[in-house]
Amino acid sequence: MSSRDKPKTFAEVREEICKRREEMISRDNQKKTKTVAQVREEKGKRREEMISRYNQKKAKTVAQVKEGKGKRREEMISRDNRTKPKTVAQVRDAKRKRTFDHVPRGTREPHAYLRNDPAPQVASVPKSVPEEKDVILDRILSNVPRRKKTTSYEFVPPKHPQEPQWLLQVMSRMNGAGDPKLIIEKNLDSNDVDPRQNRLSIPINTVIQNDFLTLDESRLIDEDEITNEGNMGVAAFLVDQRTKKWNMGFKQWFMTTDSGSSYWSFVLRGEWSNVVETNGLKEGDKISLWSFRSNDILCFALVPPTSSVVESLDK
């Protein structure tokens, strides 16, 4: 039977238990909380460290600030003395000293080398001549960049053709208010005179005076369907030179050309095909469209070309 497998005696077991207890007590002593005196001592040390750091960072007194300013002033004066131009006497004195450094002390005779200079002058600064104030001012102004002359242009509004006399007479009979406004001048295209399409297109970018609609009418046109179908838009009248009146609907369409480009356009619908037939309008005819108000109702006046008026009157 080996010594490891041999059972321990009661005394050996007690000795091991005592050793373990001593180890546990020593570990507890190392980990146990500090006393009040130890905590106060540590707080005092930390307070002293904070006070020392504060004293290093705290603001200087007035005397210390003045002392620092005096030192900086002396440094600036010394730098200025080193950089300011020397007089002729100072330059010669410095040259003499450099020369005497190579001459033995017993043979130095400064009076034999230097001559008297009764009027010392500044070596590097030329003597300034007093100038008149006007001369100085002219010299300063000559270096100032001059402003370029700007020409002002007066805005001249474009001249529109004068409203026809018959339109003023029609407005007076229909209780028209305000001045008539020129909407568009255009040459009729094939779509404008096509009875199947029955509409006059007024591209928005070609409108001459665009303030002929009220706020409610503009909102109604903007909220209309983009499909170019459905509502009639804003109800209006159209009159011609013979004071004949037609019912119209004024809308806004999104139109596309044969080339594929698209644009917004106002459109006059309703009895437009009857207007074309009655006034003998053809493709290429140049017309003018005016706008006015009659009892707050939107009205348009068509000014056809002279040849169409003559032909329609002959009929």
Swiss-Prot record:
GO CC aspect terms: nucleus
Biased composition (Basic and acidic residues): 39-51, 66-83, 100-114
GO molecular-function terms, A-Z: DNA binding
Gene3D superfamilies: DNA-binding pseudobarrel domain (2.40.330.10)
Subcellular location: Nucleus
Family matches, as SUPFAM superfamilies: DNA-binding pseudobarrel domain
Superkingdom of the source species: Eukaryota
Pfam families, per the entry: At2g31720-like
Location, primary (coarse class): nucleus
PROSITE patterns to which the protein is assigned, alphabetical: B3 (PS50863)
Region called Disordered, residue ranges: 24-129
Tagged with keyword Secreted: no
InterPro entries the UniProt entry points to: At2g31720-like, B3_DNA-bd, DNA-bd_pseudobarrel_sf
Disulfide bonds listed in the record: none
Ranges annotated as DNA-binding: 204-306
Descriptive protein name: B3 domain-containing protein At1g05920
